[in-house]
Amino acid sequence: MKTVDAIYSRKSTRHYRNVRIERAVLQEILSAGIQAPSPKNDQPWKFLIVEEEEKKEAIANILEKQLEKVGERNAMTGIIRKDIESAFESVRILKEASTLIFVYLDTNIYDMHNDNLVWELNAADVECTHIMAIGAAIQNILLAATDKGIDSLW
Protein backbone atom coordinates (compact mmCIF):
# COMPACT_ATOMS: atom_id res chain seq x y z
CA MET A 1 0.00 0.00 0.00
CA LYS A 2 1.27 3.46 -0.83
CA THR A 3 1.64 5.86 2.07
CA VAL A 4 -0.99 8.21 0.68
CA ASP A 5 -3.41 5.27 0.37
CA ALA A 6 -2.86 4.40 4.04
CA ILE A 7 -3.45 8.04 5.00
CA TYR A 8 -6.77 8.20 3.18
CA SER A 9 -8.00 4.73 4.16
CA ARG A 10 -7.09 4.94 7.87
CA LYS A 11 -10.16 5.21 10.06
CA SER A 12 -11.01 5.04 13.73
CA THR A 13 -12.59 1.70 14.62
CA ARG A 14 -14.79 1.38 17.68
CA HIS A 15 -15.75 -2.31 17.46
CA TYR A 16 -13.19 -5.09 17.27
CA ARG A 17 -13.05 -8.79 16.66
CA ASN A 18 -10.90 -10.50 19.27
CA VAL A 19 -8.15 -11.51 16.83
CA ARG A 20 -4.56 -11.59 18.04
CA ILE A 21 -1.96 -9.65 16.09
CA GLU A 22 1.00 -11.83 15.17
CA ARG A 23 4.19 -10.91 17.03
CA ALA A 24 6.13 -10.21 13.79
CA VAL A 25 3.37 -7.91 12.51
CA LEU A 26 3.21 -6.08 15.84
CA GLN A 27 6.98 -5.61 15.71
CA GLU A 28 6.72 -4.12 12.20
CA ILE A 29 4.04 -1.71 13.39
CA LEU A 30 6.13 -0.61 16.38
CA SER A 31 9.20 -0.24 14.16
CA ALA A 32 7.22 2.23 12.05
CA GLY A 33 6.51 4.22 15.21
CA ILE A 34 10.20 4.31 16.08
CA GLN A 35 10.95 5.81 12.66
CA ALA A 36 9.02 8.98 13.53
CA PRO A 37 10.96 12.25 13.65
CA SER A 38 11.89 13.64 17.06
CA PRO A 39 13.84 16.65 18.36
CA LYS A 40 17.58 15.93 18.14
CA ASN A 41 16.59 12.32 17.40
CA ASP A 42 16.10 11.76 21.13
CA GLN A 43 13.09 9.46 20.51
CA PRO A 44 11.17 10.44 23.67
CA TRP A 45 8.62 7.65 23.44
CA LYS A 46 8.13 4.41 25.26
CA PHE A 47 5.68 1.76 24.11
CA LEU A 48 3.73 -0.54 26.39
CA ILE A 49 1.90 -3.48 24.81
CA VAL A 50 -1.01 -5.03 26.70
CA GLU A 51 -2.66 -8.19 25.40
CA GLU A 52 -3.63 -10.08 28.56
CA GLU A 53 -7.35 -9.87 29.36
CA GLU A 54 -6.77 -9.44 33.12
CA LYS A 55 -4.44 -6.50 32.55
CA LYS A 56 -6.82 -4.84 30.10
CA GLU A 57 -9.65 -5.30 32.61
CA ALA A 58 -7.53 -3.82 35.43
CA ILE A 59 -6.63 -0.79 33.31
CA ALA A 60 -10.28 -0.33 32.32
CA ASN A 61 -11.39 -0.51 35.97
CA ILE A 62 -8.87 2.16 37.00
CA LEU A 63 -10.02 4.43 34.17
CA GLU A 64 -13.70 3.88 34.99
CA LYS A 65 -13.15 4.75 38.66
CA GLN A 66 -11.32 7.95 37.73
CA LEU A 67 -14.03 8.91 35.25
CA GLU A 68 -16.69 8.31 37.90
CA LYS A 69 -14.82 10.62 40.30
CA VAL A 70 -14.64 13.34 37.67
CA GLY A 71 -18.32 12.82 36.86
CA GLU A 72 -19.30 13.10 40.53
CA ARG A 73 -17.26 16.28 40.94
CA ASN A 74 -18.83 17.75 37.81
CA ALA A 75 -22.33 16.78 38.98
CA MET A 76 -21.78 18.67 42.23
CA THR A 77 -20.87 21.81 40.26
CA GLY A 78 -23.62 21.33 37.69
CA ILE A 79 -21.12 20.95 34.87
CA ILE A 80 -21.94 18.31 32.27
CA ARG A 81 -19.05 17.40 30.02
CA LYS A 82 -19.72 15.32 26.94
CA ASP A 83 -16.05 14.36 26.71
CA ILE A 84 -16.29 12.59 30.07
CA GLU A 85 -19.44 10.78 28.98
CA SER A 86 -17.77 9.62 25.75
CA ALA A 87 -14.68 8.53 27.67
CA PHE A 88 -16.72 5.66 29.13
CA GLU A 89 -17.21 4.45 25.55
CA SER A 90 -13.43 4.57 25.10
CA VAL A 91 -13.06 2.30 28.13
CA ARG A 92 -15.46 -0.19 26.54
CA ILE A 93 -13.40 -0.14 23.36
CA LEU A 94 -10.23 -0.66 25.37
CA LYS A 95 -11.68 -3.88 26.81
CA GLU A 96 -12.72 -5.13 23.37
CA ALA A 97 -9.46 -4.65 21.44
CA SER A 98 -7.10 -7.62 21.37
CA THR A 99 -3.95 -5.50 21.61
CA LEU A 100 -3.40 -2.15 23.28
CA ILE A 101 -0.38 0.02 22.52
CA PHE A 102 0.20 2.73 25.09
CA VAL A 103 2.67 5.41 24.05
CA TYR A 104 4.10 7.63 26.74
CA LEU A 105 6.82 10.22 27.31
CA ASP A 106 10.13 8.91 28.63
CA THR A 107 11.10 11.64 31.10
CA ASN A 108 14.55 10.08 31.55
CA ILE A 109 15.60 11.84 28.34
CA TYR A 110 15.69 15.13 30.21
CA ASP A 111 19.03 14.16 31.73
CA MET A 112 20.29 11.86 29.00
CA HIS A 113 23.86 13.12 29.40
CA ASN A 114 23.87 12.54 33.18
CA ASP A 115 25.37 15.98 33.72
CA ASN A 116 22.48 17.49 35.74
CA LEU A 117 22.50 20.46 33.37
CA VAL A 118 19.22 22.34 33.65
CA TRP A 119 18.15 24.28 30.59
CA GLU A 120 16.73 27.75 30.98
CA LEU A 121 13.78 26.70 28.85
CA ASN A 122 10.52 26.08 30.61
CA ALA A 123 9.93 22.33 30.92
CA ALA A 124 6.64 22.80 29.09
CA ASP A 125 8.53 24.13 26.05
CA VAL A 126 10.70 21.02 25.93
CA GLU A 127 7.82 18.67 26.63
CA CYS A 128 5.75 20.24 23.85
CA THR A 129 8.23 19.18 21.16
CA HIS A 130 8.44 15.71 22.66
CA ILE A 131 4.67 15.38 22.76
CA MET A 132 4.58 16.36 19.07
CA ALA A 133 7.16 13.64 18.36
CA ILE A 134 5.01 11.13 20.21
CA GLY A 135 2.08 12.20 18.03
CA ALA A 136 4.20 11.50 14.95
CA ALA A 137 5.10 8.06 16.33
CA ILE A 138 1.43 7.29 16.95
CA GLN A 139 0.54 8.42 13.42
CA ASN A 140 3.20 6.10 11.99
CA ILE A 141 1.81 3.23 14.09
CA LEU A 142 -1.73 3.89 12.87
CA LEU A 143 -0.63 4.06 9.23
CA ALA A 144 1.45 0.88 9.53
CA ALA A 145 -1.53 -0.90 11.11
CA THR A 146 -3.75 0.29 8.25
CA ASP A 147 -1.17 -1.00 5.76
CA LYS A 148 -1.38 -4.42 7.46
CA GLY A 149 -5.19 -4.42 7.41
CA ILE A 150 -5.41 -3.93 11.18
CA ASP A 151 -8.05 -1.60 12.59
CA SER A 152 -7.05 1.00 15.16
CA LEU A 153 -8.24 3.89 17.29
CA TRP A 154 -6.25 6.90 18.56
What do the PLM-derived regions correspond to, one by one?
Residues 39-42, 93-95:
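Solvent-exposed alpha-helices and their adjacent loops that cap or buttress functional pockets
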Residues 40-51:
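Short loop-to-beta-strand entry elements in the cores of soluble alpha/beta enzymes
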